[in-house]
Curated annotation (Swiss-Prot):
It holds the Pfam family PseudoU_synth_1. Its EC number is 5.4.99.12. Substrate binds at residue 105. The active site is at residue 52. CDD domains: PseudoU_synth_TruA_Archea. Gene3D superfamilies: Pseudouridine synthase I, catalytic domain, C-terminal subdomain, Pseudouridine synthase I, catalytic domain, N-terminal subdomain. GO terms for molecular function: RNA binding; tRNA pseudouridine(38-40) synthase activity. This is tRNA pseudouridine synthase A. It catalyses: uridine(38/39/40) in tRNA = pseudouridine(38/39/40) in tRNA. Belongs to the tRNA pseudouridine synthase TruA family. The gene is truA. The keyword Isomerase applies. HAMAP family: TruA (MF_00171).
Length: 265
């Protein structure tokens, strides 16, 4: 029996999250079904992390067991088009995708009327070790929400604001809640001092609601001791599927922009 790790990408629109649920369409559910069609009856699938309904991924990592060698292109032949495996590694028995060195998320916000300078100041406050209790849905009573943020950056890109954050781990909804707070500062509804207070939940308790899921992507999951090999054919498949999405959504974006200009919408 061999153990493999795959990098997978998925478009989250039509999934009830990544974690397996018996009566819902999920990423893990589709992967398990695909592996079974390849003859892997008990894959013991694990993922690096859970993404909520509507959240996308480019570099999610899964692990599974198989008696036969399986390549990403083989799995893709059994997967729906909104999930694509594109890199792989044979890993040791003790490899656990959850024990990653870090995870990288990107969130895209629409709009150009934000105070980007104020948002940058807020983002800098995230670096280091903090208690993110105000930015999370609690997993359970007494569970720690202390996490280390390695890097965080925000920039304007035409009509969009791009926020990228890397940390050792993230709590439930943490990135989306941070985005909500940063947007409040960008709209000048809140101050940097308020943001600093949110990072000190012992003195200031205030639940921040998460931003919409559709702007969030799990960009990468990093490990010290795993070298992934890209499956060229599978990667080209992924690039083609991304290009199809860009064409479709870019066309819809332009279409409704014209509606707005003409007063139809």
């Amino acid at each position: 029996m061999m153990k493999f790790a795959f990098k997978i990408a998925y478009f989250g629109d039509n999934f009830h999250g990544s974690q397996f649920q018996p009566d819902q369409r999920t990423v893990e559910g589709e992967v398990i079904n695909a592996l079974r069609r390849l003859g892997v009856e008990n894959p013991r699938l694990r993922s690096a992390g859970r993404t909520d309904a509507g959240v996308h991924a480019y570099g999610q990592v899964i692990s599974f067991y198989s008696e036969d060698k399986i390549f990403p292109r083989m799995l893709n032949a059994e997967l729906p088009e909104d999930i694509t495996a594109w890199a792989w590694a044979k890993v040791s028995e003790d490899f656990d995708p959850r024990r990653a060195k870090s995870r990288v998320y990107t969130y895209v916000m629409y709009g150009s009327d934000y105070d980007i300078s104020a948002m940058r100041k807020a983002v800098k406050e995230l670096i280091g070790v903090h208690d993110f209790s105000n930015f999370t849905k609690k997993f359970g009573e007494g569970e720690s929400c202390v996490r280390e943020i390695i890097s965080a950056d925000i920039r304007a890109d035409r009509e969009f604001i791009i926020f990228e954050i890397e940390g050792n781990a993230f709590t439930w909804n943490m990135v989306r809640c941070i985005v909500t707070a940063i947007m409040e500062i960008g709209k000048q509804h809140r101050s940097i001092e308020w943001f600093r207070d949110l990072l000190n939940p012992e003195k200031h308790k205030e639940r921040v609601e998460p931003a919409p899921p559709y702007g969030l992507i799990l960009k990468d999951v990093k490990y010290d001791d795993v070298e992934f090999e890209i499956d060229d054919y599978a990667f080209k498949t992924l690039q083609s599927r991304i290009e199809d999405r860009i064409i479709y959504h870019g066309t819809i974006f332009k279409l409704f922009s014209l509606f707005r200009q003409s007063g139809i919408s």
